[in-house]
Amino acid sequence: MKPSIAEMLHRGRMLWIILLSTIALGWTTPIPLIEDSEEIDEPCFDPCYCEVKESLFHIHCDSKGFTNISQITEFWSRPFKLYLQRNSMRKLYTNSFLHLNNAVSINLGNNALQDIQTGAFNGLKILKRLYLHENKLDVFRNDTFLGLESLEYLQADYNVIKRIESGAFRNLSKLRVLILNDNLIPMLPTNLFKAVSLTHLDLRGNRLKVLFYRGMLDHIGRSLMELQLEENPWNCTCEIVQLKSWLERIPYTALVGDITCETPFHFHGKDLREIRKTELCPLLSDSEVEASLGIPHSSSSKENAWPTKPSSMLSSVHFTASSVEYKSSNKQPKPTKQPRTPRPPSTSQALYPGPNQPPIAPYQTRPPIPIICPTGCTCNLHINDLGLTVNCKERGFNNISELLPRPLNAKKLYLSSNLIQKIYRSDFWNFSSLDLLHLGNNRISYVQDGAFINLPNLKSLFLNGNDIEKLTPGMFRGLQSLHYLYFEFNVIREIQPAAFSLMPNLKLLFLNNNLLRTLPTDAFAGTSLARLNLRKNYFLYLPVAGVLEHLNAIVQIDLNENPWDCTCDLVPFKQWIETISSVSVVGDVLCRSPENLTHRDVRTIELEVLCPEMLHVAPAGESPAQPGDSHLIGAPTSASPYEFSPPGGPVPLSVLILSLLVLFFSAVFVAAGLFAYVLRRRRKKLPFRSKRQEGVDLTGIQMQCHRLFEDGGGGGGGSGGGGRPTLSSPEKAPPVGHVYEYIPHPVTQMCNNPIYKPREEEEVAVSSAQEAGSAERGGPGTQPPGMGEALLGSEQFAETPKENHSNYRTLLEKEKEWALAVSSSQLNTIVTVNHHHPHHPAVGGVSGVVGGTGGDLAGFRHHEKNGGVVLFPPGGGCGSGSMLLDRERPQPAPCTVGFVDCLYGTVPKLKELHVHPPGMQYPDLQQDARLKETLLFSAGKGFTDHQTQKSDYLELRAKLQTKPDYLEVLEKTTYRF
């Protein structure tokens, strides 16, 4: 049965699917090359590690402790790469590599190599790469690289190479990349590169000052693609003009980085390509300079001349940079072929073509990245960091705001030689990535405060050749990363204090060729200036204090071409420049005046000649002043053996602070002395009071007045109890001038109050009692004067028991209350009892002992002191002074206070007795002072009631812990009938 048409179509589809699947599988499955399919039977060398990579045999023998190449005994028939870095090979001997003749790359880095003998590389005819970096090689001789005819890449950076002989590379005809950075090469010999055709040359970090055209630059030619000359101390004088002219003839992208001038000082830090030839060599014209140096005249044809492009490219220390050019035009930019970074360079066989062939793919630049460039400007993109160099020089811009569209990630912006007059804060809103801004040779006269606040990464700022007159701190706000600042060739007349304090990283400041006459205080405070150019201004002298003393890190300072006035004002400045290194001062510091010192260097003039008005010689042995000493002011200090008085001027801040400190400490000491003196005088004025005198003064609650003695008559003696007379008188009066002599006692004021005066009925009772007493007593001769009054006074208690019973009961209650109040107080009442001879009456006294009958109080006797009355129980316990002194007899019951009508009363004589005690009127008191005794009216000693119960005793003990108010106790102890 024949298959149907549908089946045939189905089978055909299946065949096509199988066929297409087979083809697709064949395309996707890699077919190994013949050489890869071959088994590599090359042995490895123990202890090394071997691998196959990119069809090459890699032998890793790094860090194995080899000291000689002869220790590697294995032979490899295939091309291989040998890694021998970080071993201990101090020397390469002749024919060391004969058995390694198939090596295409040898790495001998970091081996501390010190010498390479002649013929050490014999046998390495196919070697293309040789690494000698990080060793201790100091010379390349003419025969050092013999046997390396195929060498294309030589890396010898980070050695100590000081000398290269002119024929060192004569056999390296295929050499293309030469890396010699970070060595000590001071110069390159003539015809060194005559036999080579270098495309990459790295001479960074050496000691080159100049490169000559003849025999050096003319052999490099147009084959050079990348040249690095940074970090060399270039001497920008007439000799370097040939290098500048040669750089103008090579592709502007060939030079990576800047050629920064080191000397002379006025060109320090500037790019060589930014300096005119007439400035480098002002005595000759450009054509004369080129002719004298043998530089061929440049063609006037634009199509044959290399374009002159931006003056500066991206500066890189560890990486080379390739760049492409983009012009703001309608034409599509043509890519410039540039090599890749040679450190580490790519590895490839047949890497470099012939001299007339373009570079091959491994070194070609990738297609240009689309960039944004302002209209009318030229932009260069650096591939390594995608940074942009924007060249807008001589384009007629009037304002920075005209730069549209704004470029992205701009690193360098050149706006020199335009017509810009003012700079505003909004001008740099999209330039935060800038590290160089060139605004030189414009017409700038105004810079708004904070104009550069959007440039935090700026390292170099050029404002030279403008019309700026004043510098203020606000102009530099936001420039905390700035290192180089150029203000030369302006019309600056004023610099405000601390103008540069907002730039802590400032290393270089050029203020030369301005109109400055002085510098303000703290002009350089907060900076770390290493180089300062003050050349060609109008300085007569410079202050040290507050200005030059802040230049602690100064390396170079140019003070030339200023009209220095060599008088006394210049002495501190002279001392300062003598203390710093002589190398730091650039050029001469010549006097302009006075006439006798004209054209003489300040450093060579003696101080006596410079300032004849010096007053005295400073003490010998003082150390010289340092440049940072704060005491260097407008007069010489210990830096010289002389001192003088300055003619005038403001007082320096350091002297003012020191003076204020001296005044402050002096005031403190004077105040302390006055205080001590016043205390001492007060102690002398205060009287010395003994304890007995203090006892006499404590009369605050003494019972010193009684209504019965309003007359203040003399006291008398009596008999009662023991029948012994007892007299009492005040103690010795206070000394003259005593405080109590003019201060009345407060209790006297209270006794004058009418509420304490006796009532009329009491006065009637007193008068009747006096009459009755005089009838009962004997004749007047039986009693001493005043005793009658005392007896009459006691008779008031001698009424009928019926009449006085209630009064007596009230009296006992009041006595108990008063005793409790006195016992709880720490204030004691002192009563002094004086014993007098019986036949000596107490003249004018007020004390007495009365015995009498009648009533419950008839048996009490009373003692009076200064008008107060104290009642004693019968039996003479307290009745006489003799009883107080007789310690052999049994002690009587404790005395109690009977009744006190008032204190002091209203009797003027009693007041006078208190305020002016008549102690000095009784000489017998002085003789019998030893007989005086003091009764202390206090709880537990003199006046406790026998009837007080135990509970009352505990209460009294508790009250002893408090100190009642004086007036409160006084009120409690003042009673009336």
From Swiss-Prot:
Pfam families (UniProt xref)? LRR_8
Q: What InterPro entries does the record point to?
A: Cys-rich_flank_reg_C (IPR000483), Leu-rich_rpt (IPR001611), Leu-rich_rpt_typical-subtyp (IPR003591), LRR_dom_sf (IPR032675)
Q: Where is the composition biased (Low complexity)?
A: 765-775
* GO cellular component term of the entry, any: cell surface
List the subcellular locations: Membrane
Q: Tell me the ranges holding the LRR repeats.
A: 78-99, 102-123, 126-147, 150-171, 174-195, 197-218, 409-430, 433-454, 457-478, 481-502, 505-526, 528-549
Tissue expression: Expressed in the occipital lobe of the cerebral cortex of the brain. Expressed at higher levels in some astrocytic brain tumors such as astrocytomas, oligodendrogliomas, glioblastomas, gangliogliomas and primitive neuroectodermal tumors.
Provide ranges: composition bias, Gly residues: 711-724
Membrane topology term reads:
Single-pass type I membrane protein
Q: Which GO terms describe its biological process?
A: axonogenesis; gephyrin clustering involved in postsynaptic density assembly; neurotransmitter-gated ion channel clustering; positive regulation of synapse assembly; regulation of presynapse assembly; synaptic membrane adhesion; synaptic transmission, GABAergic; terminal button organization
- Where is the segment annotated Disordered? 325-360, 708-735, 761-790
Which parts of the sequence belong to the LRRCT domain?
Answer: 232-283, 562-613
Tell me which residues make up the LRRNT domain: 364-406
Q: What is its main location?
A: membrane
The signal peptide, as residue positions, is: 1-26
Q: Which residues lie on this side of the membrane: Extracellular?
A: 29-654
Print the keywords alphabetically. Glycoprotein, Leucine-rich repeat, Membrane, Repeat, Signal, Transmembrane, Transmembrane helix
Its transmembrane ranges are 655-675
Residues that carry a glycan: 68, 596
| Task of the protein | Suppresses neurite outgrowth.
Q: Which family does it belong to?
A: Belongs to the SLITRK family.
Protein's recorded name: SLIT and NTRK-like protein 3
Give the source lineage, highest ranks first: Eukaryota, Metazoa, Chordata, Craniata, Vertebrata
